[in-house]
Design a protein with these regions (language model features):
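Active-site groove signature of glycoside hydrolases
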Residues: 83-85, 90, 155-156
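Catalytic grooves of carbohydrate-active enzymes
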Residues: 143-185
Length: 191
């Protein structure tokens, strides 16, 4: 995350960070304070990211979100966060395996009933699909997936196994800027 924050800062761009708070990355959670202070949006993703656990039922999903909020509360105002991204996206099919075909529609309704907003992506950097893609491959993936779209929500991952994402970020930002795009957090985009 320090490299991603540095790249965003150098470009004067703010992003939205959908947070995972599993055991392997809890040591990085203090960086959320820095990210929020720099003007980035902090949003919810998952405490465990274990599909078989979180998608067993609505109760299991919300238990995971409550645990996530508990884990990030020392670093940001977790209770004020109203944006989330479902693991696998809002149209994922893996949730059906564990919670049935009605689970995702139910969860989307429950998010909205809470006055929250769920966010999906329409451009994927494909930086977490395995094989450790190069920075150039990530860049090309983003450009290809953007195509003729005028409004893009780009999914990128920031983890120990996706370090080339941070390397690709300056070129991706430059490409979007050169092609007339503006950069907004999800909060500003939906406001």
């Amino acid at each position: 995350t320090p490299e991603v924050l540095a790249a965003l800062d150098a470009a004067g761009v703010h992003g939205t960070f959908f947070v995972v708070a599993t055991g392997y990355n809890e040591k990085y959670l203090p960086l959320l304070t820095q990210a929020a202070a720099a003007g980035h949006q902090i949003a919810l993703h998952s405490a465990s990211h274990e599909y078989s656990d979180i998608y067993r039922s609505s109760a299991a999903y919300w238990k995971d979100i409550a645990l996530l909020k508990q884990r990030i509360a020392p670093y940001v105002d977790a209770e004020s966060i109203r944006y989330l991204r479902f693991p696998g996206g809002s149209t994922n099919t893996v949730s059906r395996r564990y919670g049935g075909k009605g689970l995702m529609p139910q969860l989307k309704t429950e998010v909205e009933q809470r006055g929250w907003q769920w966010v999906d992506w329409n451009v994927c950097a494909e930086d977490a699909v395995g094989g450790h893609p190069s920075a150039d491959t990530i860049y090309r993936n983003v450009v290809r997936e953007t195509g003729e779209q005028t409004h893009c929500v780009v999914l990128m991952h920031d983890s120990a196994t996706t370090h080339t994402t941070a390397e690709a970020l300056p070129d991706i930002i430059r490409w979007y800027a050169d092609n007339g795009y503006t950069f907004l957090t999800c909060l500003l985009y939906t406001s």
